[in-house]
Amino acid sequence: MDKQTIFYCYRMTHDYGINPCVFTENYDTTPHLLTEGGCMLQLRRNIKKNWADKINSKSVDAYIMAVAGHSNDGKKWRDDQGMFITPKYNHLIFVAKISEILTMKEYLLSPKSNNRRDAYTYQWLIEKYGLNQSSFMKEIVILADRFNYFGKSP
């Protein structure tokens, strides 16, 4: 039997420093973690319920495709360190092959989270709000070994 391929498609409309739809100052793509932004909440829930085991066992190939939307959160185009810029146009398409699905706890205990900005943010949230024993630690984290943007850069 042929290997099944699944695609998740959506429109990214917000960029946070740990959202995949982000660029360095030179418009290079940045993170390999695909998990942030409310637009991915339903996507993560569906993957967890229906596909996580199959993705991790490599019995399906899973991809995420998104159109990068215009965003200007809080009238800021960069974070406090000036490291990230939101896309200025709706001309970029983001595509990633999902390589692994982990729980938040598994991710934070794995070497994949070492020295990553998102991991520091998660640790801060966990400590600040006492989330160690909460359902937050069971939320899934979607990892991708590679991804690309297609289209016009701002």
Task: Give a label for each model feature.
Residues 12-14, 66, 98:
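Hydrophobic side chains in beta-strands
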Residues 17-19, 73-74, 101-106:
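Eukaryotic short linear interaction motifs
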Residues 1-59:
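Compositionally biased, charged N-terminal/linker segments
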Residues 99-154:
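Aromatic- and Lys/Arg-enriched surface recognition patch
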Residues 52-83:
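Short coil-to-beta transition motif at edge beta-strands of beta-rich domains
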Residues 8, 62, 94:
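Residue-level detector of short, conserved catalytic/binding motifs and their immediate flanks
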Residues 76-83, 91-101:
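Short beta-strand-centered aromatic/proline hotspots
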Residues 86:
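Amphipathic helical hotspot of TIR/SEFIR-family domains
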